[in-house]
């Protein structure tokens, strides 16, 4: 009887431990999955702090430049990124919600696993804070706020 109780206790502790693991925030495919997700990482912030000043300007990803047929101006960036296949790597979406490591846009701004140049082309590249903002927005599910 005592032996069954020890086994039951061990099983109970394992089940409790597994339940706590489910509560940790994670992101499939890497891309900062172990770090807390910034709840303020919204499309509005990404637009104002990343897309508008660095991507949708200077004739690159604006309605005139349309590099890679991607427009990153206010009101158009979401439809041109989330769930849209990359022109350079069609097997990847530009933004795959919850999965920065498999989002081509995230790869392009970090320079990891890409075709062509890191973005913004020729630099200056995004700051660590800007990259984290994009990563956290994707990890939050890339909501259209």
Predicted regions and their residues:
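Solvent-exposed helix-loop boundary motif
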Residues: 23-35, 39, 44-128, 132
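Post-cleavage N-terminal segment of exported redox proteins
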Residues: 1-41, 135-145
């Amino acid at each position: 009887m005592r032996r069954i109780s020890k086994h039951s206790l061990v099983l109970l502790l394992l089940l409790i431990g597994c339940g706590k693991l489910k509560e940790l925030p994670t992101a499939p495919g890497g891309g900062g999955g172990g770090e807390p997700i910034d709840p303020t990482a919204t499309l509005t912030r990404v637009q104002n702090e990343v897309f508008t000043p660095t991507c949708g300007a200077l004739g690159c990803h604006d309605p005139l430049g349309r590099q890679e047929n991607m427009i990153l101006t206010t009101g158009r960036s979401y439809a041109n990124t989330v769930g849209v296949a990359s022109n350079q790597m069609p097997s990847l979406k530009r933004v795959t919600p919850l999965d920065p490591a498999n989002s081509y846009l995230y790869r392009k701004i970090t320079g990891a696993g890409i075709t062509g140049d890191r973005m913004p082309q020729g630099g200056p590249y995004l700051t660590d804070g800007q990259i984290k903002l994009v990563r956290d927005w994707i990890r939050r599910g890339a909501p259209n706020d």
